[in-house]
């Protein structure tokens, strides 16, 4: 469960995100979409505990991220769009390091299963410098999944993946939701959002302009009936660069 209540983030006098409230239940996949600069990454970084809110509260699995950050962060995984890896650790050593960090005692049998799921078994002894951009992304996601987080935050998770890798990643994301994780997926790929997400949150200039299933959004905005998600996105945000 992810609960966001009246989250606001200011940088000086500049409002990055204003009065944002939503909930992601276990098993839900929330698509976070908006134009560049809308506040998507700021929101994800706040949910990950990297940025402190100016006001409002965030709870991960019922735990307040501000008052008990260690416990809250232990229940989430944030995979940014640029993988953060260690140059001198192999693929397997990355996972072993994460296991120690999160106290995953049963990591031994879990690591090869994750490597197989994300098609990294053949690269288990490789260093990051020997990996393609897509393989680095897969490794970052494997590290995020190792401790079986209750909340999964994904920022452009398909970056650098080939078509086979994209298909595999979609299966992985859907599987984690079925297992009960609350998932937030931020992406400019609207077809991916429409395929994977149970609900959509559209933000513009740091504010929510739509939240719900496609049917619920259309119900609140009858003028959007019969339009594609791309057309709805443009109408809601005024952004002609959607793709």
Feature-to-residue mapping (PLM):
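Conserved ABC ATPase "signature" region
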Residues: 96, 100-123
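A short, surface-exposed alpha-helical micro-motif characterized by mixed small hydrophobic
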Residues: 193-195
């Amino acid at each position: 469960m992810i609960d966001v209540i009246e989250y606001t983030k200011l940088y000086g006098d500049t409002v990055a995100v204003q009065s944002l409230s939503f909930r992601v239940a276990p098993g839900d996949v929330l698509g976070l979409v908006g134009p560049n600069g809308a506040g998507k990454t700021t929101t994800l970084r706040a949910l990950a505990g990297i940025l402190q809110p100016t006001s409002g509260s965030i709870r991960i699995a019922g735990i307040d991220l501000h008052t008990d950050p260690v416990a809250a962060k232990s229940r989430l995984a944030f995979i940014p769009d640029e993988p953060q890896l260690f140059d001198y650790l192999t693929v397997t050593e990355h996972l072993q390091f994460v296991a120690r960090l999160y106290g995953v005692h049963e990591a031994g049998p879990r690591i090869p299963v994750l490597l197989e799921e994300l098609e990294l078994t053949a690269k288990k002894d490789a260093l990051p410098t020997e990996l393609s951009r897509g393989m680095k992304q897969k490794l970052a996601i494997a590290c995020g999944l190792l401790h079986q987080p209750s909340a999964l935050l994904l920022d452009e998770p398909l970056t650098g993946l080939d078509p086979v890798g994209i298909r595999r990643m979609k299966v992985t994301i859907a599987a984690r939701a079925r297992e009960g994780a609350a998932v937030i997926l931020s992406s400019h790929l609207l077809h991916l959002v429409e395929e994977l997400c149970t609900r959509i949150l559209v933000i513009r200039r740091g504010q929510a302009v739509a939240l719900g299933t496609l049917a619920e959004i259309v119900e609140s905005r009858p003028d959007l009936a019969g339009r594609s998600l791309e057309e709805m996105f443009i109408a809601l945000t005024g952004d002609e660069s959607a793709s």
